[in-house]
Amino acid sequence: MLDYKEKFIGEGLTYDDVLLVPAYSENLPHEVNLKSKFTRNIVINTPIISAAMDTVTEHDLAISIAQQGGIGVIHKNMSIQRQANEVRKVKRSESGMILDPITLNEEALVGDALRLMAENKIGGIPVISKERKLKGIVTNRDLRFEKKLNKKIADVMTTENLVTANEDVDLVKAENILQNHKIEKLPVIDENDFLVGLITFKDIIKVKQHPNSCKDEFGRLRVAAAVGVSKDTFERIEALVKSSVDAIVIDTAHGHSKGVIDLLKEVKKEYPNLDVVVGNIATGEAALDLVRAGADAIKVGIGPGSICTTRIIAGVGFPQLSAIMNVKKALEGSSVPIIADGGIRFTGDIPKAIAAGASSVMMGSMFAGTQESPGETIIYEGRKFKTYRGMGSIEAMQKGSKDRYFQEDENDIKKLVPEGISARVPFKGSLKEVMHQLIGGLRAGMGYCGAKDIENLMDAKFIKITSSGMVESHPHDVTITRESPNYNLR
């Protein structure tokens, strides 16, 4: 018979149970380096990730967070084609050089050009032959007074004195060409006049505006996308890869299961160069099994999220700080990074998660209230809110997240067993403003701990505190008269 003491594997701590111990520092907060790893092969400039939730991350938020140095994970509660398009919108949003620009052939009509410009929010389209040789370019100026929608694009496009650049052009040279010729689009061609890319003045401006952007080797913003353990997983992955997704996230409530491990092995066999994040787990044993199966990053978190009810409904979970530390200990010496998913309530929880062993943190509720999130904006008692729901809520499961909770084959809504709720969160303004506070809190924590970079922060020490210590940590014995942008107790 199992000894009673063996039933308990240890003490479970979460962020509110500890504080970081201050240490000698030679670094001011603005001097610290925030670069970290999202996966084994992908570096991010800010260790912050937006969650793959249908009220959090679609292309608008993914673009914004990548511009701030982090990365977004596009949720999967949508059709395969739409998710692939969401990824494509992020990859096309800005680029050193657009490698696969939207084009028109010579036989296209004015109506085709106007439709493509409206759909993709662009002001110019290169016109090519069937062999992809550049023939001209059509811009909104060419079409401004054109009323005949069935007129051939070849009759209105610019062909004379067409300004182009060679393949070896860099952004500095490209900017000079654009300025000297007072144009906004610069087609890039090879020695045989084949179109190989497009450089736009807008992209050059964006590079200057967002110097800390998280980008791939081609200068495009990075983005990840979620997939589940379902019948269409490989079809979804194929579409995402064609859209140039940087990584996929096998997103399940229980990553330490045979179906997930088998899927991971199959994905890595089929796509050996595609980085795959797997989760969610909470133990060292689970982490080792997933790494052996080929995981490029491990997502840790069973039930810490504000809208998750797994710990209450299923009685299963693991306090988040201890879960991160257990997984970190098991992966000691491994190059596979840990993503701490859920439970972040204050900016100070971010340095705590990293000190426990996470390379980055994933958040949902922090971003659900931003203007870039896809949640519905509502007015309640005179204040603006946005909807926010767990992927285990009834509403999200109906939309497509049933497989995350291993209930894919259940079609009767009355028989679904939800592990999440639907809620609302206060409207917070732009994601840039929220990220400023999150990054500021992380920098402050690193400065107090004497950590010059993320790796150094992992050496920081903790002290456990009592409930009285937590009371002392918060503002006390006063009435708050003005709200702070980075502190509230709601």
Model-derived regions, located:
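Glycine-rich phosphate-binding active-site loops on the catalytic face of alpha/beta enzymes
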Residues: 67-82, 245-257, 296-314, 344-378
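Catalytic cores of alpha/beta
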Residues: 60-62, 235-243, 276, 282-300, ...
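Bateman/CBS regulatory modules and CBS-like beta-alpha motifs in cytosolic regions of diverse proteins
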Residues: 30-44, 51-53, 82-120, 127-129, ...
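Short beta->alpha transition motifs characteristic of CBS
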Residues: 74-79, 122, 126, 133-149, ...
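Short beta-strand/loop segments at the ligand-binding rim of alpha/beta enzyme cores
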Residues: 43-50, 96-101, 160, 216-226, ...
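Active-site-adjacent beta->alpha loops and helix N-cap segments on the catalytic face
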Residues: 30, 79-88, 146-150, 194-214, ...
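Alpha/beta catalytic cores of nucleotide-metabolism and tRNA/nucleoside-modifying enzymes
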Residues: 1-24, 105, 166, 226, ...
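Catalytic beta/alpha-barrel core
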Residues: 73-77, 103-104, 124-126, 164-166, ...
